[in-house]
Amino acid sequence: KKQHLEANIPTRLYCEVEQAQMERAIQNILVNAIRYSPSGELIRISLSETHGTIRGEIENTGVRVPDDAIPHLFEAFYRADTSRNRNTGGTGLGLYIVRKVMEMHRANYGISNINNGVLFWFELPCKQPVDNSI
């Protein structure tokens, strides 16, 4: 689709997670961003850490989610706006899986419309590494 990806990810972040599940969740979010962004649009991904919490944001431009669909996006098999979904594929389980993984990790998460696109965000509480240098 020739979309543009802009990544702002620190070289080192520490957080104990179920790696395979967290990778799947982030992959599902990225797949949705790619799937619902028109060719040539920008997708941004960023991660940051503040006070033991990692905040992740994935933003895509070009297509907004209908406001009445936002509360349902994390439900199993829910797909918003069928006119856009006809050619996109998918089962309606991607964001449901994201929800389950985020809940398992006690993370806050959400989706909101911004300007001319969508922002998915999560805030993941993390244990700090033990300093064994003493």
Please report, for each region that a protein language model flagged, where it lies by residue:
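A residue-level detector for a conserved hydrophobic packing site
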Residues: M22-I26
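Conserved catalytic submotifs in the C-terminal HATPase_c
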Residues: H4-Y14
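Short beta-strand/loop element within the Bergerat-fold HATPase_c
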Residues: G40-G52
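Short helix-loop "hinge" at the ATP-lid/N-box region of the Bergerat-fold HATPase_c
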Residues: A33-I34
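Short conserved segment of the HATPase_c
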Residues: V65-F77
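Short alpha-helical Gxxx[C/S/T] motif in the catalytic ATP-binding
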Residues: G89, G94, V98
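Glycine-rich ATP-binding loops of the HATPase_c
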Residues: R106-S112
